[in-house]
Design a protein with these regions (language model features):
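Helix-to-beta-strand junctions that scaffold the AdoMet/dcAdoMet cofactor pocket
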Residues: 87-89
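Mid-domain Rossmann-like dinucleotide-binding core that forms the NAD(H)/NADP(H) cofactor-binding site
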Residues: 1-60
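N-terminal Rossmann-fold cofactor-binding loop
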Residues: 38-42, 73, 121
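Helix N-cap at the beta1-alpha1 junction of Rossmann-like dinucleotide-binding domains, i.e.
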Residues: 41-43, 77, 100
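Hydrophobic Val/Ile/Leu positions in short beta-strands of Rossmann-like dinucleotide-binding domains
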Residues: 13-14, 72, 95
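A short acidic, Gly/Pro-enriched loop at the edge of an enzyme's catalytic core
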Residues: 62-70
Length: 173
């Protein structure tokens, strides 16, 4: 996706630190990447270095260095603009969400110097197999909190107030 995993070196930014980023972080670290996490959640920012991130902070914060690539999981267009600002020349930005609010006022200078922005629309079964194999080697163990469908409101409140690590799943019985 970003080209960094294939090289086995570089500085990767993860914007949004939910389920997907939690699984990508240890894989990227295992492959030799230096990972920088951007999240609005204080608790997630505190957890990221414990999982191997070099640095963690808010999306508007300046990391200690420019990034070679970044993946935006957050569904907010303004976060993509912030990610572009943090890229090195010829850096690649991957928009990984299936939905995002509009990206407003994108200044051309953020794309200048051969920066690249792409989306991820299709993932093949082989892509998933390869990632799961790599994730297992990196010791990734997804964290899942299961709620019965009848407790959906409780799950949403918990997600908003506490944002537990990993995924919340509603079980339909």
């Amino acid at each position: 996706m970003t080209g960094l995993l294939e090289r086995g070196e570089g500085r990767l930014g993860l914007f949004g630190f939910g389920s997907s980023a939690h699984m990508i972080l240890p894989v990227a670290v295992r492959r030799g990447l230096r990972v920088y996490v951007f999240t609005r959640s204080t608790s997630k920012a505190e957890a990221a270095p414990k999982m191997g991130a070099e640095w963690a902070g808010a999306p508007m914060a300046e990391p200690p260095c420019k990034l070679d690539a970044a993946i935006v999981f957050a569904p907010a267009g303004w976060v993509a603009v912030e990610a572009l600002k943090k890229l090195e020349k010829a850096g690649r930005l991957v928009l990984a969400g299936i939905y995002m609010t509009p990206i407003e006022k994108l200044e051309y200078k953020l794309l200048w110097h051969e920066r690249e922005m792409k989306t991820v629309a299709n993932v093949t079964r082989q892509d998933v197999r390869e990632f799961l194999e790599e994730a297992a080697k990196a010791g990734v163990r997804p964290r899942v909190t299961i709620y019965p469908l009848e407790q959906a409101n409780k799950a949403l409140i918990e997600l908003k107030q506490r944002a537990p690590p990993g995924s919340l799943v509603l079980m339909v019985s």
